[in-house]
């Protein structure tokens, strides 16, 4: 059994999905060393990530970059000599995680305690104490499980889950009744994972027809609001895009009937809250939704059209493998899942 950890860090990209995986890794450390000081380092969007993890009092979120030297000094003060530091795997095949992050992780970790993942960087062999192979046929969460095993830390949590600060005022604010609405989240962080605006509208209309007695609640960011209004035009959907905080969204998801989403952070929040989820993904997002990610019994229906990209992903403004998904079938599944 690994010795108790006094302090540990993980470096992550500043997205909801990546930070959820970082929290899962740290949560397993916390289960084995509850007194440990644990930090998740991001380059930006720390306010959003703190909101995401407001229910985790033991988790420190640190935003560190070259524009925030004070944060770098704070990391040195609080986490120098860490018993374990884990950096993130590369976001795409042939890529590599930030070299500057790797260098700073090396400075913070005790000798023998820096774990990373194989990627395209030629510097890895000089920096890391242990490198974990990344397999494209494995679920994303399996990378973090492999890092825990490499560190000798027992995996206490078989699958990622999420806690939130319960507050039913979100239901009252948006005039919703628990169990009588569906969250519809059709906006990814970039168009390369999303649906064309016309397809968004087709899906909202199909959902409205298939679920006439269920309120549709269209979520998204502030920049998505105008498109959300266009997608829902002529329906009775409630538009909350740009109005709900992450904690409010978690409360709404927890009290919803179902979530319909493209492959983005909100879908993973729903999956980790164990809510019935209908998710549409691209061919390159497959590893995020393999059964090892959330378990064979997770209430998740996955829609994809990988066959369209059989010869390789067709990168377009809006991906062909998303455009080919049958939105009528998605709407039908939202009724029955």
Label every PLM stretch briefly.
Residues 1-337:
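Catalytic machinery of carbohydrate-active enzymes
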């Amino acid at each position: 059994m690994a010795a108790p950890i006094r302090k540990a860090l993980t470096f992550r990209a500043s997205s909801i999905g990546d930070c959820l995986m970082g929290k899962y890794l740290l949560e397993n450390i916390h289960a084995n060393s509850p007194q440990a000081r644990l930090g998740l380092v991001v380059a930006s969007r720390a306010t959003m990530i703190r909101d995401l993890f407001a229910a985790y009092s033991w988790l420190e979120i640190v935003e560190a970059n070259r524009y925030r030297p004070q944060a770098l000094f704070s990391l040195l003060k609080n986490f120098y000599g860490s018993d374990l530091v884990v950096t993130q795997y590369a976001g795409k095949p042939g890529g590599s995680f930030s070299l500057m992050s790797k260098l700073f992780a090396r400075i913070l970790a005790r000798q023998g305690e820096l774990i990373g993942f194989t990627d395209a960087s030629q510097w890895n062999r000089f920096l890391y104490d242990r490198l974990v192979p990344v397999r494209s046929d494995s679920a994303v969460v399996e990378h973090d499980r492999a890092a825990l095993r490499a560190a000798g830390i027992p995996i206490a949590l078989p699958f990622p889950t999420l806690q939130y600060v319960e507050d039913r005022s979100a239901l009252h604010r948006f005039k919703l009744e628990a169990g009588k609405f569906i969250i519809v989240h059709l906006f990814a962080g970039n168009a390369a994972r999303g649906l064309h605006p016309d397809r968004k509208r087709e899906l909202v209309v199909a959902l409205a027809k298939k679920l006439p007695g269920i309120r549709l609640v269209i979520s998204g960011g502030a920049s998505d609001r105008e498109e959300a209004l266009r997608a829902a035009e002529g329906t009775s959907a409630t538009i909350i895009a740009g109005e709900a905080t992450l904690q409010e969204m978690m409360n709404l998801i927890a009290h919803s009937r179902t979530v319909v989403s493209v492959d983005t952070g909100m879908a993973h929040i729903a999956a980790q809250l164990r809510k019935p989820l209908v998710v549409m993904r691209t061919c390159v997002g497959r590893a995020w939704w393999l059964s090892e990610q959330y378990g064979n019994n997770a209430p998740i229906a996955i829609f994809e059209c990988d066959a369209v990209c059989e010869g390789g992903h067709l990168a377009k403004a809006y991906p062909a493998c998303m455009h080919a998904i049958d939105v009528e079938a998605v709407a039908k599944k939202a009724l029955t899942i």
